Amino acid sequence: MPESDSQQVRAALAGLTAAWRKGKTASIGAMLHPSVVFVHPGFAGRAEGRTACVATYDEFLRASIVLRYEEKEPSIDVFGDTAVATLRWEMAWEMGGQRSDDAGHDVYVLVRDGGRWLIAWRTLISAPPT
C-alpha cells in the first residue's frame, strides 16, 4: 500500500528532526527546497536558501547543548502539491552556561517536487509549556 501524502510529509519532518538531533546537519540541505525561507521568531528576520537555512541549525548546535527535546505528532493539511504542517515541541538547552526552557510550534510549508516533499518555508511560534 503506498504511503499517503500526509504520511510522506510526516516522514519528511521526522527526517529533519532526526538529522538535527543527531548533529547531521549536512543531510538537511537535501530536505529543503532550493528557495527555502526560514522566518525568524516574531518575524524578526529571515534566512533564505538552503545554505543559510542549514546554517541556522549549525549555529544553534555549536552554541548550545540540548538537554531535552520532545515533540508531538504534527498536524498536516495537504492541498495538491502543497502541505502545511504544525508541530508542537518542548525543549531545554544550555547556551553560554545559562539554561533555557521553551515550548512552541514550528509551522512548515512543504511542496512536492519531483515526487519528494521538500520544506519550502518555516517559522517558530512560542507557546507556554504544558
Features from the language model and the residues they span:
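ATP/adenylate-binding site constellation spanning eukaryotic-like Ser/Thr protein kinases
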Residues: 33
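A beta-strand edge to alpha-helix "cap/lid" segment located at domain peripheries
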Residues: 1-27, 37-130
